[in-house]
Swiss-Prot record:
Residues annotated to bind tRNA: 14, 64, 66, 112
PANTHER family from the UniProt entry: PEPTIDYL-TRNA HYDROLASE
Species in which this protein is naturally found: Bartonella quintana (strain Toulouse)
Entry's localization field: Cytoplasm
Enzyme class: hydrolase
Name this protein carries in UniProt: Peptidyl-tRNA hydrolase
Gene: pth
Keyword Acyltransferase: no
Known partners and oligomeric status: Monomer.
Length: 193
């Protein structure tokens, strides 16, 4: 059994923010597979289905980004899931737009959602970090992450979301290198800034 969590902030005013790319990926996965209707429990929106024959829960914490670990911790404990079967998808300022990095464990790199998960759940889980680019100045970070993706961002964002959804089974199978290579190939001809 697997848990895939996308990080973001709840509410219509945040749905197109760069910070919500994790929620966007979860929605793309949800649309690509047969998942149950969303239900609200564990301070989250949660759905379950099968990905490549593996029972999988999708979760979008509704606690706001900085408290994501509360909701995720509840789900992990309730279903008695091991961290090795947990994948979190989040935005990453320090990667160029559309770039993907996958790793297990490590630091939070200043990401408050990851910091919350680490505090509530531990650190030994798979992190899929999706580049949203850095605005260049620390003073502009808050405005950048809470800013909406632009029309030109859709040139790389839509293919990225689609490629991740179609290839998420590779991560569940444990083939991180092939996952990253496949995503890179699917988005390499897109206009990344």
């Amino acid at each position: 059994m697997w848990l895939i969590a996308g990080l973001g902030n709840p509410g219509l005013q945040y749905q197109n923010n760069r910070h919500n790319i994790g929620f966007m990926v979860i929605d793309a996965i949800y649309q690509s597979f047969s998942f149950s209707p969303w239900s609200k429990k564990f301070q989250a929106e949660i759905s379950n289905g099968l990905i490549d024959g593996e029972k999988t829960f999708l979760i979008k914490p509704q606690t706001f980004m900085n408290l994501s670990g509360q909701a995720i911790g509840e789900v992990l404990r309730f279903y008695k899931l091991d961290l090795k079967n947990f994948i979190v998808i989040c935005d990453e300022l320090d990667l160029p737009p559309g770039k993907v990095r996958v790793k297990t464990a490590g630091g939070n790199n200043g990401h408050n959602g990851i910091k919350s998960i680490d505090a509530h759940c531990g650190t030994d889980y798979c992190r899929v970090r999706l580049g949203i680019g850095h605005p260049g100045s620390k003073e502009l970070v808050h405005q950048h992450v809470l800013g909406n993706f632009t029309k030109s961002d859709q040139e790389w964002l839509s293919p990225l979301l689609d490629a991740i959804a179609k290839n998420i089974a590779l991560l569940i199978k444990g083939d991180r290198c092939l996952f990253m290579d496949t995503i890179s190939q699917a988005t390499k001809n897109k206009n990344l800034q």
